[in-house]
């Protein structure tokens, strides 16, 4: 029995807001950030017959890759809780979140590079974030995975990771694969396409409504499943 294929459009945009500087938006990221890329492109020159395997094709078809927009070398002094990078203090304040208060002495150090993308959909679609398992994770990192419904919940994704050895630097280069995103819906055999959308005050307002974790622990997941009240019918436009 053949099943009809559906095509769902996912809107994406660089996340252009930072609370670090009042009334400052990261408009330059529009040109600095790379467009998400289909990860199946890694095999475009491969002649191996595994490419004919429908199980492999189905697995890869809804994955996209996110590349690093900047060169960063991060060095951490865990004892003194200080960092040193190859960029300016302004860059560090905006894009690097060394999450000192979110791990214990016995844990691996936790950090986020806030190279953020926001994905939205006009029907229920779940996003999953994965390490760059085909291209290779940035050295000395272990990626933090996640998933949520981008119809109900408007929040960005970023490169959050544990440092495997905080006595050694984490180095990423512009254009280096950082992580993957994958989209899943309830429709059988669904396909997706990505469409760049404009960053707007409306998106920012919706996103701020999806940040209860800043104030109350244990509430985000319950609210995500309930949905963002008063979200407009259409965000992908």
Specify the residue positions occupied by each region the protein language model found.
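Non-catalytic terminal segments and appended small domains
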Residues: 1-156, 162-237
């Amino acid at each position: 029995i053949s099943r009809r294929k559906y095509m769902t459009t996912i809107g994406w945009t660089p996340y252009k807001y930072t609370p670090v500087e009042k009334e400052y938006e990261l408009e330059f990221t529009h040109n600095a950030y790379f467009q998400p890329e289909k990860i199946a492109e890694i095999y475009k020159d491969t002649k191996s017959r595994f490419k004919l395997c429908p199980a492999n094709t189905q697995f890869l078809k809804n994955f996209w890759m996110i590349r690093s927009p900047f060169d960063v070398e991060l060095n951490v002094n865990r004892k003194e809780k200080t960092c040193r990078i190859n960029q300016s203090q302004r860059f560090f304040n905006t894009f690097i979140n060394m999450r000192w208060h979110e791990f214990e002495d016995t844990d691996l150090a936790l950090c986020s590079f806030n190279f953020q993308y926001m994905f939205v959909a006009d029907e229920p679609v779940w996003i999953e974030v994965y390490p760059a398992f085909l291209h290779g994770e940035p050295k000395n990192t272990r990626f933090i995975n996640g998933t949520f419904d981008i119809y109900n919940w408007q929040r960005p994704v970023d490169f959050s990771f544990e440092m495997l050895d905080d006595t050694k630097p984490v180095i990423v280069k512009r254009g280096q694969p950082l992580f993957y995103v994958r989209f899943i819906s309830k429709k059988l055999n669904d396909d997706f396409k990505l469409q760049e959308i404009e960053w707007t005050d409306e998106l920012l307002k919706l996103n701020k409504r999806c940040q209860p974790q800043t104030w109350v622990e244990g509430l985000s997941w319950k609210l995500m499943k309930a949905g963002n009240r008063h979200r407009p019918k259409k965000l992908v436009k």
